[in-house]
Amino acid sequence: MLKLNIIFNLLGKSWALISTFVFIPLYVHILGIEMYGIIGFYTTLLVILAFADLGLTATLTREVSRNYSHQKGGNTYLMDLLKTYELLYLFISITIAFIVYIVAPLIVNRWLHLSSNMNPEDVILAVRYLGFAIAFQLPANLFYGGLMWLEKQVSANILQILWGILRNLSAIFVLYYFSVSIVNFAICQFVSNLLYCLIIRSYLWISINPDRVKAAFKKNVLLSTWRYSTGMAMMSLISITLGQADKLIVSKLLPLKEFSYYSLASTVSIVPMIVAEIFGMAIFPRFARLVKENDIDNLSKLFLKGGYLLSLCVLTVSISLMFFSRNFLFAWTGSSVVAAKAQNVVILLLIGQTLQALALMPYYLGLAHGYVRINLQMGVISLLILLPCLFLTINKFGLIGGGISWALTNLLVTTFLVVKIVKRFLSSILLRWILQCILFPLISITICLWVLKLITPINLMFSQWRIFVCIGISATTTL
């Protein structure tokens, strides 16, 4: 069962990545690059409003993993917890839908910069439907988290994959065969999220409460879990603000079409972090066990070995995308204009994301020791640097300014953070880690890919699939 859960977890993550890169070019092709900016803004808004979760999903998953019982009648506490959180989320969702509905005209007319050929009334209606879609997706995340920690990971990932297929294929079908309208896209998202929320909620309740025992709202449940949920909410607030500030400010300061280019560049730049998180899923449990056993020798060996493998994979992917950014963007979107506009932004965003990906190993080392305060402190410092930097660089340099700010902030803060954590817990191998796991892979991979780029010239006259194959061969050869 454990192996099956791991396989379906990987399938779920793989599908999320694959679907993103498959469907985005279709949306760009059907709707146009400027209208795609509304989808990019919807994604940003969804992540920002996830703060309204208030740490409830993290708290539910922790409580389920701690208290779930296979015995009949043994889950009364969890049923009351789920009912309490569910009713609280109902209030949160209604509030989100109401607020987005009211402020939609302000978003369209005062925040986003639409061109003259876009109908503001259609965009306002679309934003309102997307607000309803968000209102149902957030509680669905709560129910998904509950299923994952009940070890119903196969079912949870199947439901999530089917939901992803439904919301994307339904939108593509309606846009292609009926009417090319951002309103139609928004309605498809709303209906798909509503169905997914209702189905995954029903499945979670059946799993926790097969005997259909009546659960009730309990105030004491909130009182007993508020400290943990508040702490998680604060970490979430910092993380969300840090991750979305650049997109939010770009959407405010630049035309919608420019924001579309930035959104596409951001999508490409997340790949190194996804690669790193796959390593993190495997490494963190072993870190935690070795820290608990105070086995410093094996912890050091695992940190160096894992760090080297992570750097090898992350840097190969990152530097390949940097060297072939224009080629990759053209092969992905089929647009030479997108490739020209977004290539430099991709490179700068990749620098920042690569630094964060390489920091994942020290980050998990700190978590294994229960050392989380430094992450909060560095998050706050990052915001203090990033926010003013974004306003200055975007106003001065335009689209590329967002990438400059992101790269500089991570270069300053992330570098300091990882050195501090490694020095605190594994000081004896700090220099060796920097040389073996960072500098050596960075230099060797850069040289290899530079040589491969010289001997394998890829131009935009190639077919899209041929470009993908050439980039893939170059990256694989480096490994």
Where are the predicted features?
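Interhelical loop/hinge segments that connect adjacent transmembrane helices in multipass membrane
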Residues: 2, 182-186, 200-243, 286, ...
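Signature of the first transmembrane helix
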Residues: 2-66, 93, 97-101, 133, ...
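Membrane-interface junctions at transmembrane-helix termini in multi-pass inner-membrane proteins
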Residues: 2-5, 135-162, 183, 204, ...
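Interfacial segments at transmembrane-helix termini and the short loops linking adjacent helices
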Residues: 106-129, 322-353, 461-462
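Hydrophobic alpha-helical transmembrane segments
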Residues: 13, 157-207, 228, 380-385, ...
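Helix-loop junctions and terminal segments of transmembrane helices
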Residues: 23-24, 54-70, 149, 208-209, ...
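N-terminal membrane topogenesis motif
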Residues: 1-21, 76-87, 122-124, 204, ...
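Transmembrane alpha-helical segments of multi-pass transport proteins
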Residues: 128, 382, 432-479
